[in-house]
Amino acid sequence: MLYDELVSLIDSKNTIYKELNDSIYSAKTDEEYKQASIRKKHFVHVYSQELYDFLWSRLSELTAKNCIAFDLVPYIVWAQLSERYSIIIDTVKKLK
């Protein structure tokens, strides 16, 4: 099911996201903090792009009910995805 696959993808990405947050929290020097922050920023971009790509590739299966999975996406990732997500939703509406 699309919902289960989407939740699985989000869960796996959220695990990495948490590890990156932890590395920022655990940074001992300014340089470690800076590098950890850069890694997190890059990952947020990758995470949002992978969600977009997944959704776009499964567009014909996407329903409003499946979209409840997006409640699990961190806000910072959602903020990057939301503009592209509206394109997907508009396309889904046209298909149905």
Question: Which residues does each PLM region occupy?
Answer:
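Short terminal alpha-helical segments
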Residues: M1-E31
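Acidic, low-complexity, intrinsically disordered interaction modules
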Residues: D30, I38-I88
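Short acidic DE-rich linear segments
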Residues: V92-K96
